Amino acid sequence: MFAIIQSGGKQYRVQEGDVVRVETLKGEAGDKLELKPILVGGNDTLLGDEAARFTVNAEIVEHGLGKKIYIRKYKSGIQYRRRNGHRQPYTAIRITSIA
């Protein structure tokens, strides 16, 4: 059985035991979360009110920073060059059950 959950404006397809990196969530490592699925699939696909009967239980594994990306700006002819770096914070969660 799988479910599609929404977190931080993005949707993720998850199954039991998956570890997923989502946008930063409040809480410490080891805290439990309950997420509502948008869609639940398996032998039958359930949407809307039918999927709302289910809950996706998860546990926070860690907080961290993603891979560094570099942003470069350049304007020709005037020697304008800029380079900035960015590391997006994330929260890794482990899906414990879909019930």
From Swiss-Prot:
Recorded GO molecular functions are: rRNA binding; structural constituent of ribosome
List keywords of the entry alphabetically: Ribonucleoprotein, Ribosomal protein, RNA-binding, rRNA-binding
Q: Which InterPro entries did the record assign?
A: bL21-like (IPR028909), bL21-like_sf (IPR036164), Ribosomal_bL21 (IPR001787)
Q: Which SUPFAM superfamilies does its entry note?
A: L21p-like
Query: What Gene Ontology biological process does one annotation of this record name?
Result: translation
A single GO CC term, please? cytoplasm
Q: Is the Cytoplasm keyword given for this protein?
A: no
Which PANTHER family does the record match to this protein? Answer: 50S RIBOSOMAL PROTEIN L21 (PTHR21349), LARGE RIBOSOMAL SUBUNIT PROTEIN BL21M (PTHR21349:SF0)
The UniProt subunit note reads as follows: Part of the 50S ribosomal subunit. Contacts protein L20.
Q: Which family does it belong to?
A: Belongs to the bacterial ribosomal protein bL21 family.
Q: What does this protein do?
A: This protein binds to 23S rRNA in the presence of protein L20.
Q: What protein does this entry describe?
A: Large ribosomal subunit protein bL21
Gene for this chain: rplU
